[in-house]
Curated annotation (Swiss-Prot):
It comes from the Eukaryota. Its main location: cytoplasm. The keyword Cytoplasm applies. It comes from Solanum peruvianum. It is found in: Cytoplasm. Residues 40-154 form the sHSP domain. Coiled coil: none annotated. Forms oligomeric structures. This is 17.6 kDa class I heat shock protein. Induction: By heat stress.
Length: 154
């Protein structure tokens, strides 16, 4: 295991040409510099989400430490789009408080994914446990066509 961080991502990085990703292209994302629509540069605004496909479903996982399920929205839109969003508010400051360090992220995030044709959009389920959001989108069963062998004469 390397102690040097990978600058250009890892084997699971999303391809720029991924037909299912509809996030806004950010050329500085892999270098650790980000540009956010809201002007925020927090890590929270750039929440990373894993998407894996199993034989039965598409499964999305997001680490959202410190968020309650009421602060997270999972929505499905027309045209097979899954949208995951949330907001963590900035802690209220008291004039008598002296801050020595502020490292926790706050702000909003929103990620959108276009799902393939086999997604059952009417059966999406979401759960949140220990700060990990899991969204499961079942897949349609694929009917394997009957294959008939043809005898070759000659």
């Amino acid at each position: 295991m390397s102690l040097i961080p990978r600058i250009f991502g890892d084997r699971r990085s999303t391809s720029v040409f991924d037909p299912f990703s509809i996030d806004v292209f950010d050329p500085f994302k892999e270098l650790g510099f980000t540009v956010s629509n809201s002007g925020e540069t927090s890590a929270f605004a750039n929440t990373r989400i894993d998407w894996k496909e199993t034989p039965e479903a598409h499964v999305f996982k997001a680490d959202l430490p410190g968020l309650k399920k009421e602060e997270v929205k999972v929505e499905v839109e027309e045209d097979r789009v899954l949208q995951i969003s949330g907001e963590r508010n900035v802690e209220k400051e008291d004039k008598n408080d002296t801050w020595h360090r502020v490292e926790r992220s706050s702000g909003k995030f929103m990620r959108r994914f276009r799902l393939p044709e086999n997604a059952k959009m009417d059966q999406v389920k979401a759960s949140m446990e220990n700060g990990v959001l899991t969204v499961t989108v079942p897949k349609e069963e694929v009917n394997n066509p009957d294959v008939k062998s043809i005898e070759i004469s000659g």
